[in-house]
Amino acid sequence: MACPCGARVLVEILTGLLSLKNQSPSTPPESEGEFTRNYILGPKYIIKAIEIFSTMPNTIPPFEYAPVKTTWLKRDVLLFAHSIGCKAGDELHFLYELHPKFQVFPTYPIVLTFKHADIDIVDFLARNAARTLPPGCPVLDWSVAVDGRRRMEFLCPLPPSSEGKTWDIHTKVLGVFDKGAGKGTVMEMEHVLKQRESGQVYTRAWESVFFKGTGGWGGERGPKMNEHVPSTPPRRPDAVSSFQSNAESAHLYRLNGDYNPLHATPEPGKSLGYGGTIMHGLFSWNITARAVLSQFGGSEGRRLRDFEAMFSSPVKPGDKLDILMWDMGLCKRATSAVRNDESLQEVRFMVKVGDRVVLSNGKALLKCEDEGVEVKL
């Protein structure tokens, strides 16, 4: 598939060369040089242009969707906290709406890109199949889509309910990349949660979606998935936490709004080579955020400023997840969610099931002090 930008240039070349300055065959050119340029070299340039532009990759330009309204209730944020394993005790303020420090777990907005304003279950595959795709993008099958990478910046704590104000998710496709025949396609997107009346941005998130086996359509290869991502240090972790999932963990988590059948019944996972049902990638991502915040942030949601990780291999219901964390000390301002006068603590992490890495290249940034809470070093 030729590059759309190249096609436009090719049209301009053809138009210019074939117009021959609007001369008819009976009108002689003004000079011998002009005759050579128009009638002899012109066709050669056309052929060369066709050769060049026919081999150029299809570059998908950025594409922005219309804002999508989203809503949530206190019940939704309580359900989310329960689904990622928050416990009564040090995390009761995420689980009980009358707690004096009741707050929304900071990564909750990640599920709003699925939930929108729904109050009931929706057909995940039908909704995504109805998406408008960027010009030049091939048709993508969401039944073969899995998470590649997620990152979120936290600019303002979310209120316990959306009631009384209007909230929108602004989604932009940053690029669509062809990883090769038999491999797959990667779509990079950005999601911004904004309060409409004030214009205040609350969170900004980035995701890479990998569509298995859909490559070879002539698109740009794009960057490697592991370029410019943090790595874990070659030493023993400073903290380790474990989470034991069960057969119903995915069924509970999906009630947050992600109703992909891949995480509810064995058949889709078997057809994709996973052997059965797999957990939501964001389930592992969110329980890891909870572990990092508990270990290094005193379970204080406002401390979390930035969180990211790559999805390396699937997790199955019943797997035990071991979360390995490294304290990297203080770091400089590296995110728009942080004020210039704030100090940040950086934590690197990975997650394993046995010896297999399931989350890699993880990094969290936490505010060092918040209302007298000491940093756990």
From Swiss-Prot:
Region Disordered, as annotated, extends over: 220-243
Q: What class of enzyme is it?
A: oxidoreductase
- Name of this protein: Probable dehydratase NIT22
Its keywords, alphabetically, are:
NADP, Oxidoreductase
Q: Which GO terms describe its biological process?
A: fatty acid beta-oxidation
Can you list the GO cellular component terms from the UniProt entry? peroxisome
Summary of the function given for this chain in its UniProt record: Probable dehydratase; part of the gene cluster that mediates the biosynthesis of hydroxamate-containing siderophores that play a critical role in virulence via intracellular iron acquisition during macrophage infection.
**Is NADP tagged as a keyword?**
yes
Q: Give the pathway listed in the UniProt entry for this protein.
A: Siderophore biosynthesis
